[in-house]
Amino acid sequence: MQNIGFIGLGNMGAPMAENLLKAGHQVKVFDLNQAVCEKLAQQGASVCANLEELAQGVSCIITMLPAGEHVRSVYLGTHQGDKGLLDLVAENSLLIDSSTIDPQSARLVGEEAAKRGLDFVDAPVSGGVAGAHAATLTFIVGGSDNAFARAETILKDMGKNIFHAGQAGDGQMGKICNNLMLGILMSGTCEALNLGIDNGLDPTVLSNIMLQSSGRNWALELYNPCPGVMENAPASRGYQPGFMSKLMLKDLGLGLDAAAKSQSSVPMGALARNLYAFHNAAGNEELDFSSLFEFYAKNNNESVG
């Protein structure tokens, strides 16, 4: 068992930290939300007031942060002179960033960590809040072979599938590709279901037809976006997230940014991003990303192409 620091206790980070505690690790936590910190303290975590306190006496730190700028400031420090983790942790520490951010930020942190003799991996996750609670997440890891081997022993306490995608930044690229496809698949699934309903088909029957046909996909099988078709899906719970629409828009934006840098053609990804941008602008950003189904239902007589 290890002494681990955990920074970022949101919908994903909090249950991930809980699973580390359940696995027997000593866990120190830091987050601006004191309520969630206190909840974890009741389960045995030590609450820290700042990064300096958290970095003392730990061999590994895990971060789960909103965006690239937060990751850069936490690891590299701020323009105001605040030190980052790279200047606070002990020699030979392991640093794991499970945020979903741009690959360039992950590579920058990885390069700076290597200069200091530190092991860093970017390890974004797939599996959502349910996977975080159940410790069944998929981790997509970028980093050296040695850093991956060290990280894998800890990631297994929070997830079921751990993939080594390549060097620092490659974990982010793998996650971006996955979520680009997820956004496209969800958009297409919403579109096909809406078309069938408009033409008199029962959505449950249509879903079952497609599940046994070539249109079968993850959204149909585990996350049906039509209310009432799948009992435990967000669609049948008023689109309570889950994975919020604003986060899907963010990830699709990361995909388009990456495509621009590599001059890759992503017309379907661009369309999916535009659909989510319209959907979010209508006040749906806090709803689950499968709520895009409602966008189609409300725009039947309008062109959305």
Regions found by a protein language model. Give the residues of each.
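Hydrophobic beta-strand scaffold residues
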Residues: V27, V47, D119-V121, I162, ...
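Rossmann-fold NAD(P) dinucleotide-binding segment
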Residues: L51-D119
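NAD(P)+-binding Rossmann beta1-loop-alpha1 motif at the extreme N-terminus of oxidoreductases
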Residues: M1-M64, L88, N92-S93, V129, ...
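Rossmann-fold dinucleotide-binding core
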Residues: I4, V74, T100-L180
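Helical "substrate-binding/catalytic lid" subdomain
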Residues: D170-L271, L275-N300
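Hydrophobic residues within alpha-helices
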Residues: M16-A17, V109, I154, L195
